[in-house]
Structure formats: structure tokens, C-alpha cells
């Protein structure tokens, strides 16, 4: 049963925020990402952009909330983390022995939780190898570090930062390596408002470990920990499984999950929730 949005922050002492797609929004980085994939991996940017728009718009065989299996080029639909349908890239159902089984970590699947992972899936589908994908990702992150105002939308950030003093401890956790994200974090002013920023944390498993550490380090109960993020698999699922509170920033209207998290369409809706909890 979903939590009451008006009390989601009541009694919370520790807050953990995701970075990409949470504290900034928008997909202004996508054209640069596709250009890099063309340069490093030969991806057709116009074809890729068309497919990406369909994926993010919910009118493609692969949708936000699905998992893509690059080994078989198949799409796995698992709304409750048990596979109920497998399709090809274009959405045609196929027989697959995995139907009815659960989803686990470390299976080489790409969870489509945001535009970053949607681009990754499109590239893999069209044969861009992992090395070219990695080089493209690194190049676009470097570009973001020097052109964040042009590529990212941080218009809703300041009101959220203004509400953080209510928490005894707050930190940012991101899977992006420090050398690729530290300049962006600094330009957003996050070190001034968070006690720590952790890079390359290997979510979702890294978040599971960090929650365990936080419970002991700050002598808090799970109900006194709040996590805010946009990627359900990486940010929200580990949080609710640990019994903590969660705000899911879901701009794509992903297929509903019967979970206890509060879901919002964008970062602008987060600040009022933090304010209401006082």
C-alpha cells in the first residue's frame, strides 16, 4: 500500500538522494550521447533518436520499466520482478523459458529506468560493443561537466536543497565514477548541502550495503531513512525491501508497482513533500 505523501518525511533522520535523473532532470544530454555513439560505435543517430523517443514515449516494444537482455536481444516484462512476458525488440511475444521466473541481480540485463539506460539498450541492440558504449558514456559525462546549464535541467533543485536541514544526515549516491561526476556535483552546489557524496557505488547492491551501514552508524530504524531516486531497480526497490521510506521520481509514468513508495512526476514535487513532513 503506498505511503501517505503528506507524511512521507515525518520522523526521517537520514536522507539519501540519487544524482542522475533525480537532482537534475531532462534529456538534453541525449543528442551529445548519440553523437558519441556514432563516432565510437557507428550508431545511426537519427535511427537511434527515433527509437529512443518511442521507448520514452511508451510506444515501442521496449518501454521504461522493462528489462533488455543484450545476449538474446529480447525484452523482459516483469512489473512485480517476476517475468510475465518476453518479446522481441519490436514487441512481438516469444516463447522463453524464463517466463514465470524472478529477476535477480548480476544477470547482464539492462533495466530501462531512465533515458541513460534507454540509450544504452538502443546502442546494444544495434551492435555497438561495450567498449564503444563505455567510451561514449565517458565522453558525454565529460561534456556535461563543462556544459551542465546547456544539457541538464536543474530548475527544481534549489527548493529541494532548501529543505534538507530538517534531516540530521543526508548524502548523494551515484553509480557514476568520481572523475566523471565530481565537477558536475560541485557546479550544482551539492557538497554545500550534503554531508557526503558517494561515487561509483554499484547500485542496487551498493545501496543495500549503504542502508545497512547507515542503520548502524546513525542508530536509526529503517522507518527513519528516506531514499529519493528515479531508477526503480537501483534506488527504490532496495529501499523498500529494507523497510525504509522512498520517493520515486518517475517522469515516464512507468507501469504501476504495488509498493509502499510515494511516486512523483518530477523533482518539483519533492520539495513540498519534505516541507509537509515538518
Kindly give the residue locations of the regions a language model identified.
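Asp-based, Mg2+/Mn2+-dependent phosphohydrolase catalytic module
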Residues: 1-13, 158-162, 171-278
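Short, surface-exposed acidic
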Residues: 41-53, 127-138, 192-193
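Catalytic-loop motifs flanking and including active-site residues across diverse enzymes
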Residues: 29, 115, 210
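Short, acidic loop-to-helix structural element flanking the phosphoryl-transfer center
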Residues: 11, 16, 112-113, 145-171
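Active-site neighborhood of HAD-like aspartate-dependent phosphohydrolases
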Residues: 2-54, 60-67
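A metal-dependent, Asp-based hydrolase signature
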Residues: 58-143
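Short, contiguous strand/loop micro-motifs
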Residues: 106, 147-148, 222-223
Amino acid at each position: 500500500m503506498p505511503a501517505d505523501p503528506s507524511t512521507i518525511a515525518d520522523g526521517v533522520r537520514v536522507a539519501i538522494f540519487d544524482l542522475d535523473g533525480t537532482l537534475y532532470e531532462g534529456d538534453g544530454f541525449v543528442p551529445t550521447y548519440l553523437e558519441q555513439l556514432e563516432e565510437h560505435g557507428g550508431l545511426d543517430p537519427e535511427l537511434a533518436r527515433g527509437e529512443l523517443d518511442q521507448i520514452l514515449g511508451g510506444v515501442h516494444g521496449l518501454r521504461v520499466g522493462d528489462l533488455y537482455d543484450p545476449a538474446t536481444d529480447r525484452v523482459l516484462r516483469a512489473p512485480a520482478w517476476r517475468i510475465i512476458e518476453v518479446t522481441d525488440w519490436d514487441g512481438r511475444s516469444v516463447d522463453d523459458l524464463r517466463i514465470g521466473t524472478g529477476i535477480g541481480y548480476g544477470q547482464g540485463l539492462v533495466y530501462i529506468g531512465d533515458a541513460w539506460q534507454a540509450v544504452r539498450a538502443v546502442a546494444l541492440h544495434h551492435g555497438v560493443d561495450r567498449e564503444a558504449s563505455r567510451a561514449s558514456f565517458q565522453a558525454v559525462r565529460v561534456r556535461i561537466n563543462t556544459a551542465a546549464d546547456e544539457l541538464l535541467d536543474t530548475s527544481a533543485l534549489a527548493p529541494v536543497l532548501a529543505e534538507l536541514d530538517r534531516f540530521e544526515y543526508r548524502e548523494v549516491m551515484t553509480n557514476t565514477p568520481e572523475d566523471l561526476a565530481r565537477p558536475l556535483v560541485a557546479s550544482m552546489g551539492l557538497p554545500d548541502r550534503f554531508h557526503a557524496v558517494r561515487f561509483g557505488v554499484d547500485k542496487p547492491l551498493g545501496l543495500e550495503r549503504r542502508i545497512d551501514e547507515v542503520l548502524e552508524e546513525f542508530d536509526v530504524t529503517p522507518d527513519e531513512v528516506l531514499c529519493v531516486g528515479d531508477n526503480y531497480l537501483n534506488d527504490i526497490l532496495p529501499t523498500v525491501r529494507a523497510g525504509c521510506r522512498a520517493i520515486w521520481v518517475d517522469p515516464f509514468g512507468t507501469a504501476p508497482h504495488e509498493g509502499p513508495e510515494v511516486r512523483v512526476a518530477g523533482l518539483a514535487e519533492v520539495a513540498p513533500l519534505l516541507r509537509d513532513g515538518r
